Amino acid sequence: MRIQSLLLLGALLAVGSQLPAVFGRKKGEKWGGCPADDGPCLLSVPDQCVEDSQCPLTRKCCYRACFRQCIPRVSVKPGSCPQDQLRCLSPMNHLCHKDSDCSGKKRCCHSACGRDCRDPARG
């Protein structure tokens, strides 16, 4: 009985170590995403972090105003944004800033003229 328990524990640990790869996350990468960064680069500031594991629990290491820093993560909906083949002739206009600004399964995606809510790409 004891050997079976150890084998089961070993198998669970082996499978658990592969979960980040299965779900597309790197080891040490936290759930969630980084908020959009629309800020201009005003200063050359050294990065405050290199990876998520250097940040407190609810924060991710994200680019913000031209350098990496620990900021609150945002929820990310499943699926990827469709490619936009258009060119914008008007000024950028953002209709959303993060996925939670969009209804249902729609994601906040970059388009030619800014960000807007779109259905995720199929595939």
Swiss-Prot record:
Gene3D superfamilies: Elafin-like. Residues 1-24 form the signal peptide. One of its GO terms (biological process) is antibacterial humoral response. The keyword Signal applies. The keyword Signal applies. Putative acid-stable proteinase inhibitor. This is WAP four-disulfide core domain protein 5. It comes from Macaca mulatta.
